[in-house]
Structures are given as C-alpha cells and as structure tokens.
Amino acid sequence: VNQTPKPAGDAAPTAPARNVAALNAVDFSIDGKTIFRGLDIAIRRGEVTAIMGPSGTGKTTLLRLITGQLRADSGRVVVEGRDVAGLGRRELYAMRRRIGMLFQNGALLTDLDVFENVAFPLREHARLPERLLRNIVLSKLHAVGLRGAAQLRPQQLSGGMSRRVALARAIVMDPQLLLYDEPFAGLDPISMGVVLRLIRSLNDALGISSVVVTHDVREISQIADSSYILSGGQVVASGTPAELREHPSPVVHQFMDGLADGPVTFHYPAPDYPAQLLDRSEGT
C-alpha cells in the first residue's frame, strides 16, 4: 500500500514508546451515570487490540475519549505520549489527523462517488497535485479490493463494499492509529471474512496500531493480539484471546461462550412468579 510522502527530518530517530495510546485510571460519567471507574487500557504499538463487552458498557465512549471528543473526569488519556486533555484545539486537530476511524455505518457521503469519498480527507487536509492525489486514492482502493469501483455511487454498493470504501478512506491519510467501531455489524459471512482479513493485513502492511470495538468474539479472536473485556465500568479481563477463554471469571466465561444465563441474567428482576399471579392488587 502506497503511503503519502512525509518530509524527512534531520534529527536521528528515537525509539517509539511501546504504547501508542493508553487510558490510565480514567473515571468518566454522563449525566450522573458512571461509565468508567479507574479504567486502565494500553494500546500496544503495531498490534490489533479488541475491546469487547456487553451492550452499554461504554466501548464506543472509549473511542471518543481516545480522539478527544470526550474528556475524562479524572485520570489520563495519552495518545502518542501526549495527554489529550492538555492539547489545544490546533494540537487536537493535528492528533486526529493521525487517527483513522471506521464507523459502524460506514458514513459515506452519498452525493460523492467512491473515488471522491476516499479523496475527501486529502482534499480537506493536504495540498497535493491532482496526479499524486489520484495515485494515492487508487492505491488505497486497490488495497481493499475496490479500485474497479472508483466511479460507483454509495447507493450502488453492498453493505460489505461500503464498509471497505470507508476503510480505504480511513487509511488514506496514513494514520498511526486506526479505530474500528463494530466493523462487522450487519455484514454477511463473506463480507465479514473480507473485513476481518483487511483489518489484520492492513495493520501489518502499514505498520499501524488498531483498536476494534466489537461483539463478535469468534471473529475477532482470529486476529487480535490482545483483548479487553469491559463490564460495570471496569476491565474485568484482559489478555490474548486464548487466555480469555481460560479465564476463571463467570462474567468472562458467559461473554466468551455466548451463554444466555449467568451473571448477566436472562430474567429481569421481578417478584415471585406464582405470588404475582395470585396478587389481585396488581393491575394487568
């Protein structure tokens, strides 16, 4: 995959930090509701990190904390060695340009064709000759297998193709960190397999780091280097997919195996069933 040119510096390169991003003792709440309490997560450089957990545990909120769209109540969110809370507006925008984002719905611009959807970030943020821009866009589309679809409109694409176009757009600025929000949602098995392979292959080919928020345990376990399971505002387990499958926690066991009942119960709390049936004071 071709990368956009970057100016060469005179200084000798220094060894990059082990973590491209980290959340340290993060507390966060919305409207008085606690989302995270003392959250600790490390996104290691060059790896695919999975963020999993039941619905409503704040997985997408975590991505917004990393990008600075939300600010933690306490603790630190660090990206590329810098505390996000301490960045000014210009520095924050510069940081976001080094982060790619694949949204669950793809978020393609319906009035632009595939080529212009992928070209959009370059036209907004880079002053490139048209020929160079064209070559970069085509190379990214080629990387996701859709160079031949450059002139199609979003309405002509399948769900899987739309997701791949959005992925090409997410990598067009050569990000150092790529964030995926439920990338497999709504995809058929073939499309899911294609996106799964692309997440791993692009991560390795581009030398980037990836964070994948997902419920799809079986699929992400095939490619993730490390995984975190969130529940109750905290990390309840972390490790490789193999380590999580052997984890002793009942919550982790229920989630990894997709069990209908367990710590997360099947029945919503209710009075004793026979007693409720006999209670004439309750309305229907």
Question: What are these model-derived regions, one by one?
Answer:
Residues 52-54:
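The feature captures the beta-strand-to-loop junction immediately N-terminal to the Walker
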Residues 67:
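Helix-to-loop junction immediately C-terminal to a conserved catalytic motif
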Residues 82-83, 130-148:
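Conserved ABC ATPase "signature" region
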Residues 153-157, 161:
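Conserved ABC ATPase signature
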Residues 174:
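Conserved catalytic motifs of ABC-family nucleotide-binding domains
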Residues 178-181:
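Catalytic Walker B motif of ABC-type/P-loop ATPase nucleotide-binding domains
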Residues 257-284:
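ABC ATPase nucleotide-binding domains
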